[in-house]
């Protein structure tokens, strides 16, 4: 079973750490993570879609 599909409550600490690393390297937060590492600016546009 993929770590992304497995519930966090059923993961070992090692699996949780690996999943977190994957999310920061490939998920939406990867843009913010990479910009912080390279000291570049990122424009974040937030909107309320009510």
UniProtKB/Swiss-Prot annotation:
One of its GO terms (cellular component) is U1 snRNP. Coiled coil: none annotated. Residues 7-21 have a biased composition (Basic and acidic residues). Residues 1-36 are annotated as: Disordered. The modification Phosphoserine is found at residue 9. It is found in: Cytoplasm, Cytosol; Nucleus. The keyword Cytoplasm applies. Its main location: cytoplasm. The keyword Nucleus applies. The modification Phosphothreonine is found at residue 12. The modification N-acetylserine is found at residue 2. It comes from the Eukaryota. There is a cross-link at residues 6, 8 (Glycyl lysine isopeptide (Lys-Gly) (interchain with G-Cter in SUMO2)). Signal peptide: none annotated. Core component of the spliceosomal U1, U2, U4 and U5 small nuclear ribonucleoproteins (snRNPs), the building blocks of the spliceosome. Most spliceosomal snRNPs contain a common set of Sm proteins, SNRPB, SNRPD1, SNRPD2, SNRPD3, SNRPE, SNRPF and SNRPG that assemble in a heptameric protein ring on the Sm site of the small nuclear RNA to form the core snRNP. Component of the U1 snRNP. The U1 snRNP is composed of the U1 snRNA and the 7 core Sm proteins SNRPB, SNRPD1, SNRPD2, SNRPD3, SNRPE, SNRPF and SNRPG, and at least three U1 snRNP-specific proteins SNRNP70/U1-70K, SNRPA/U1-A and SNRPC/U1-C. Belongs to the snRNP core protein family. This is Small nuclear ribonucleoprotein Sm D2. It comes from Sus scrofa (Pig).
């Amino acid at each position: 079973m993929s770590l992304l599909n497995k519930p966090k409550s059923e993961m070992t600490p090692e699996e949780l750490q690996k999943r977190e690393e994957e999310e920061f390297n490939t998920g939406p937060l990867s843009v913010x993570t990479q910009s912080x590492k390279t000291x570049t600016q990122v424009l974040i546009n937030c909107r309320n879609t009510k």
